[in-house]
Amino acid sequence: SGLRIERDLPDALSLDRERSIAVFRLVQEALTNVQKHARATQVDLVLETRDDRLCLRLRDNGIGLDPSKTRKLKSHGLRGMKHRVDAFGGRFDIGAAPGGGTVMTVEIPLTDLP
């Protein structure tokens, strides 16, 4: 495929089943979108915990997103990703990366809110 993926992942990460599945699906959909649409040669994937949140960032060096699709999340895949994050009370952002390409950032609470 010619897509290089640079990963910065924690040595150990303990997530409940629902969050594990959500993160897997988010990364899967994001990489599928990059492969199909971005014409990218590299993706940087960072997964870390900060305070009580799981933080995921994917950045590619592709052609970028059509702003009309990101503004209102018109793409079915992007809407699905946002809904998946919203289910945990998280935050989902996607847009142009500085210097070109696309960056997606996700923050999900590590525990359910009471």
Feature roles, as predicted:
Residues 1-114:
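Coiled-coil dimerization/phosphotransfer module
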